[in-house]
Amino acid sequence: MKLTSHDIIRKPVITEKSMAAMAEKKYTFMVHVNANKSQVKRAVEEVFDVKVKDVNTINGLGKTKRMGVHVGKRSDYKKAIVTLTEESKAIEFFDGLQ
């Protein structure tokens, strides 16, 4: 399956910790589970028109949930923490959230 830039970046992660990291030009996104670091870097540079210095990824396993006798599982996920270069501008998507 060929992933486009908009397929790779699912949604931003808005938490207290991720908001504090924005001061250091670190932005957190939920990304496609099959995307690798170079694909995430290319996608962020294309979509937001910024320069990426570093990408760290975290794989998360979905929790097992029960509803009575029925057992289900939430989807696995991947988060990417993207660090921008010093001369790069901030991502406008997050500007209104601070």
UniProtKB/Swiss-Prot annotation:
GO biological processes: translation
Keyword Ligase: no
Xref: Gene3D superfamilies: 3.30.70.330
Family: Belongs to the universal ribosomal protein uL23 family.
Role played: One of the early assembly proteins it binds 23S rRNA. One of the proteins that surrounds the polypeptide exit tunnel on the outside of the ribosome. Forms the main docking site for trigger factor binding to the ribosome.
GO molecular function: rRNA binding; structural constituent of ribosome
Keyword flag Magnesium: no
Keywords associated with the record: Ribonucleoprotein, Ribosomal protein, RNA-binding, rRNA-binding
Subunit structure: Part of the 50S ribosomal subunit. Contacts protein L29, and trigger factor when it is bound to the ribosome.
Listed GO CC annotations: ribonucleoprotein complex; ribosome
Encoding gene per record: rplW
Annotated protein name in UniProt: Large ribosomal subunit protein uL23
Pfam families: Ribosomal_L23 (PF00276)
PROSITE patterns per UniProt: RIBOSOMAL_L23 (PS00050)
Classification via InterPro entries: Nucleotide-bd_a/b_plait_sf, Ribosomal_uL23-like, Ribosomal_uL23/eL15/eS24_sf, Ribosomal_uL23_CS
Organism: Clostridium botulinum (strain Eklund 17B / Type B)
